[in-house]
Amino acid sequence: MSEKIHIFDTTLRDGEQAPGSSLEVEEKIEIAKQLSKLNVDVIEAGFPVSSKAQYQAVESIADMVNGPTIAALARCIENDIEKAYQALKGAEKYRIHTFAGTSDIHIMGKFSDHKYGKDLNEKRNTIIKMAVDAVSFAKSFTGDVEFSPEDAGRTDINYLCEIIEAVISAGATVINIPDTTGYTMPEEFGEKIKSVKKKVKNINNAIISCL
């Protein structure tokens, strides 16, 4: 990938999680139009499966706002990905952004059921398969697929590199490396990004994003 910097704006999705923040669909459309005027590269418009209002907002922005790529969030679940596609399909350009928790804390909390594995290592392998399957499924709808290893800041670096390499091989074109809980110091997070770039063999086949 080239060294061009791409501006990814998530005001309408992650920004709305701020305490007291709640936007009507019409307000989201207006913000998206203003972001388009600013020439941002990607607008993450929402999480379509989470509510009817979220779906409507993403669908309306996809239909009405031209210029930027319109992105929608989806868990590593086929129904989420299908909903994202249905909301996005009217867009000039669109991206499906899928994610899975990868830190030990997230894995043992969100994937505690034995169906995901009897121990941490088995659960880690299950999550890699889920992520690969999700990226492959999303690729059937669009060539532009982003993957986020949620809570990357607290994720074991070797496991982080393993799952990133696997999803890039499956077709992910953007890898977001989020410090979801604000756990790491800036220097520490920078070292984590350096390690990913050094250890992931196919990292040059994807854009790295850090949110």
Predicted feature locations:
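Divalent metal-dependent hydrolysis catalytic cores, especially in the metallo-beta-lactamase
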Residues: 40-48, 71
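Alpha/beta enzyme core
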Residues: 2-7, 14-42, 55-64, 78-208
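Histidine-centered divalent-metal-coordination microenvironment in nucleic-acid enzymes
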Residues: 211
